[in-house]
């Protein structure tokens, strides 16, 4: 499938908030809390990108916010619809392009990923993120991997790879 990546609009964010699984518990305990947390996350982000399919429907959001104790490091986040489970190479290629843009603003991207999110960890590793051994995250008490990517360490995409996924 082909996609268009642009800066996210409020309509993209609203659509993705409604598409979130309220039973996942990742962004809160109910639909309202999910939407509120996504909106707060977007508001604190310096970049929010959306991928839209051929019909113009948002299918992924990526964002980055400055780390509170070091504004040169970006705390990266992403949210994707289920269709990318059948198209992991497309999602990996799109993510690589978006993360390269983010690294134009930040010297490093990082976050903590729950060890149970194996596909997310493998996606980030395949793009070039370093995945640290699992450790208990002090803020959440959850076993997480610290993942990070420094500027200059991104997997470059050839024009052929880009044209396969971009409109």
Spans of features found by a protein language model:
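A short beta-loop-alpha structural element at the N-terminal edge
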Residues: 1-18
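Charged interaction scaffolds used for protein-protein
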Residues: 45, 52-53, 153-156, 165-167
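Conserved acetyl-CoA binding element of GNAT-fold acetyltransferases
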Residues: 71-85
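Conserved catalytic-core motifs of GNAT/GCN5-like acyltransferases
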Residues: 112, 130-145
